[in-house]
Each structure stands twice: as C-alpha cells, then as structure tokens.
Swiss-Prot record:
<comment type="function">
    <text>Nucleotide-binding protein.</text>
</comment>
<protein>
    <recommendedName>
        <fullName>Nucleotide-binding protein MXAN_1478</fullName>
    </recommendedName>
</protein>
<dbReference type="GO" id="GO:0000166">
    <property type="term" value="F:nucleotide binding"/>
</dbReference>
<dbReference type="Pfam" id="PF04461">
    <property type="entry name" value="DUF520"/>
</dbReference>
<keyword id="KW-0547">Nucleotide-binding</keyword>
<dbReference type="InterPro" id="IPR036183">
    <property type="entry name" value="YajQ-like_sf"/>
</dbReference>
<dbReference type="InterPro" id="IPR035570">
    <property type="entry name" value="UPF0234_N"/>
</dbReference>
<dbReference type="InterPro" id="IPR007551">
    <property type="entry name" value="DUF520"/>
</dbReference>
<dbReference type="InterPro" id="IPR035571">
    <property type="entry name" value="UPF0234-like_C"/>
</dbReference>
<comment type="similarity">
    <text>Belongs to the YajQ family.</text>
</comment>
<dbReference type="GO" id="GO:0005829">
    <property type="term" value="C:cytosol"/>
</dbReference>
Length: 165
C-alpha cells in the first residue's frame, strides 16, 4: 500500500550557518556597535538566544537572524518566540525555541483534516511524525496538496518523505 511520512525537521548545518552569518553581520554593522548584541545557538540545538542591551536592539538582531534563516530555506514556522526578558542591569534577551518533530496535537489536527476532506487515505501518528497511507498514488498526492494548502493556517513546518509506492 502506498504511503508517505509527514515530518518537521530543521537542517542543523544550515541553522548553524545562519546563526554564524548573523553573528558576523552583528559584529560588523555600525548600528550594532557597542550594543553587545549576540546570537547564541544552544549546544543541543533546541533554542537560539538573542541578546543585546535594549529591547529594540534585540528586535533588530532577531530580524537579521530571521532574514538569514529565510535565505537558507529554514521555515520560520519552526520557531517559537519566548518573551523578551531582562538579564541584568542593562541587558535583555529573547529565547527562540526550535521545533523538531510534529507535536501530537498538530498531528491530530492533520488526521482530522484528512478525515474531513473525505479522501481515501488514513493518517497514523508515529511519535513525532505522521504516516499517511492510501490505495493509490493520486490520493496521496492530493493529501500532500491539501497539507501544503493548509500549512499557513496550521503554522507548521512540514516536509514529506519516504514516498513509497
């Protein structure tokens, strides 16, 4: 029976490159001189911390980071923004969590979307991914088209892998 998997993964090499490019740009741009602006990727690749000496500099550094991520084809749907918080007398930071895998509640939404569309496919939740099976290839391609159409509404980064006939 034909099937494919829906996953949400970030290319960690591209993520590291984007963070390094952001660091380089922050160190060379004139408007960031003396602001102690920095972008740090957590050692376990689960979060990015943006630091500076004021909220508007954190926002500006975050915009630079988002631009670099978008240029490297990393979906911005895979980011969860934390609150901007003070870390000392003159420092501010924001933690951006990286979403790897599809959360269970989003998987349930995707399965419900398949059932509501009345397509002849079934979705099964497997840990942090979703497997979609159907009787023929055309149904699976229609399911992929449906997921791509609803991707903005669901605010979920999705890739389709392991397409088997």
């Amino acid at each position: 029976m034909p099937s494919f998997d829906v996953v949400s993964k970030i290319d960690l090499a591209e993520l590291d490159n984007a963070v390094n490019q952001t660091k380089k740009e922050l160190s060379t741009r004139y408007d960031f001189q003396g602001t102690h602006a920095d972008v740090v990727l957590a050692p376990d690749n689960t979060a990015i911390t943006v630091k500076a000496n004021s909220e508007d500099r954190v926002q500006a550094a975050k915009e630079v980071l988002l631009t670099k991520l978008a240029k490297r084809n990393i979906s911005l749907f895979a980011l969860e923004y934390g609150d901007i918080e003070k870390t000392g007398l003159h420092n501010v930071k924001q933690v951006i969590k990286l979403q790897q895998g599809i959360p269970v509640e989003k998987s349930k939404e995707l399965v419900k979307l398949l059932k509501d569309s009345k397509m002849k496919v079934q979705g099964s939740i497997q840990a942090d991914q979703l497997r979609v099976t159907g009787k023929n290839r055309d149904d699976l391609q229609a399911a992929i088209a449906l997921f791509r159409k609803e991707q903005d509404r669901l605010k979920l980064d999705m890739q389709f892998i392991n397409f088997r006939d």
